[in-house]
């Protein structure tokens, strides 16, 4: 079947900040040519490594972020290497890059130069702070961007005096920037193909992408001069809310978002459930139901609800609490470790979220996370594991640029590829 982006050719010159964007395009069918230095993409040297054996071809970070891509090694800082990229750009739809501002321009590979030889090319630049402004050349990591954007200030604990903000793991800042970079790139592509037939430069700031996800923090300050504060395991806010984490009988935690429930119907269902074991107690008093009906929050009543629900959840295993709550439309969930999702049939069997990808060099298949979307007519799939370093160099330079064997030998001997 046809893939959604299978007619697109994308050149990628990235580091760890931009490689996820290339993966998203490749997994939807685009031909993504990863242009690596002869020493390899920086992520290839980042662990953990398969089998705990550090190697240029065993980084799990690189594996995940480079599925379906092709790899060519080119030293773009040489005149010949830069010329090779320009030749590839003549027939490319997109150049995706996450190098520092002005770096590609200094090599003759920026948008202003490439658009002269290919007016239809879209160049998407993913940088920490964008191409303009006083921060444009500032160094940043995922942690720096999460801190600068305000995200970290909303994450942490309210029950540990003086505790600092914390940052979630997993390069979430880079992932957010890359997701929005792909959306903006496809928007530019749509404009090109439906209106102007002209490409454009897309300037993506990870800092701005993250700042736009702080939800009500900015409006609260702008309109009310209120600063949201951190709350353990739940949403930050300007008003303290009850704890949402409750221990079950088997020691696992339930995240009970709907406590107290927001509707009378859900309240009635919760009380009926608790009454099955005689644990609703004074919650049967109509004054609690009236509070829910009026959408008010009387502190003493809320505290009583939380206390009794906590005892109720502690009387049963987490799986029972989770599934029974969902049956009556309460937004409760088990707080899982990431690996526990691998055992959930909803994801493994029904959704097929974890594909197995074959690696011929090890003659083994490995389980990967899939995509959070499915296409009924243009399927998403991982057809190839991440490329070995330079695995496709000879094929691409021969088939796309008509280099012969003698040319390729000379390029390799001179260190260009």
Where are these regions (language model features)?
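Aromatic-enriched alpha-helical interface/lid elements that frame and gate functional surfaces
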Residues: 242-243, 247-328, 332
